[in-house]
Amino acid sequence: MHYPDHLRIITVCLTWQSGFISIDSAPLQKSYMTAMEIWLLERVEPLYRIYPWKALLRAGSRGCSETDYGQNLMRKMMMAYDSEDKEYARLAGFGYRMLAEAIKAELPYHISCPALLICGEKDKAGSAKSYNKKWHQREGLPLKWIKNAGHNSNTDQPDEVNRLIEEFISEADRRGVSG
């Protein structure tokens, strides 16, 4: 077909790569959690409000990371709220309530693109380790365990986590996966 110059259309086609990477996270399907776990997620704020700040600071930093570097990063983030510990409780509580709402919505949250689950072998945050094991088993998603890493495995072992992410992206590029 011939178009007049003023009607010529240039089409640019961009291909977007799609993928899902979960780092020390959990599935949002209600079937993975107990009613008690969801109930507790909805009540983090009042719990954090009555928890002595110094004890919460210690538990938060030690509970999320295995390395000094990871613990110091968590402590530094939390220390931004040192004089506003009630604000920290409010923000954390809000985040956990939103998580509980997403779970209670009972949406399918089906992952239909290439995916990778990453979890620290020493993750002590809630039931993250068991959630990831079940997620891997039920959905068949690849799961990589990070040695000497806790819940913030990307701060405990950043080189290993980055290597896995780069491998995942390279594999998606090689396959030409698009979204």
Where are the regions a protein language model picked out?
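Short aromatic-enriched loop/helix-cap "lid" or pocket-rim segments at secondary-structure transitions
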Residues: S31-A35, K129-Y131, D156-P158
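Glycine-rich nucleophile elbow surrounding the catalytic serine of serine-hydrolase chemistry
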Residues: M1-H2
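Conserved alpha/beta-hydrolase catalytic His-Asp/Glu region
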Residues: S31, R49-H110
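Conserved loop-alpha-helix segment in the C-terminal half of the alpha/beta-hydrolase fold
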Residues: S112-A149
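Flexible "cap/lid" loop of the alpha/beta hydrolase fold
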Residues: I10-Y48
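Active-site loop signature of alpha/beta-hydrolase-fold enzymes
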Residues: L28, A125, N152
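Alpha-helical elements of Rossmann-like donor-binding domains used by nucleotide-donor carbohydrate transfer enzymes
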Residues: K76-M77, L91-M98, S130-K133, E160-E167
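Catalytic active-site module of serine/aspartate enzymes centered on a nucleophile-bearing elbow/loop
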Residues: E139-G179
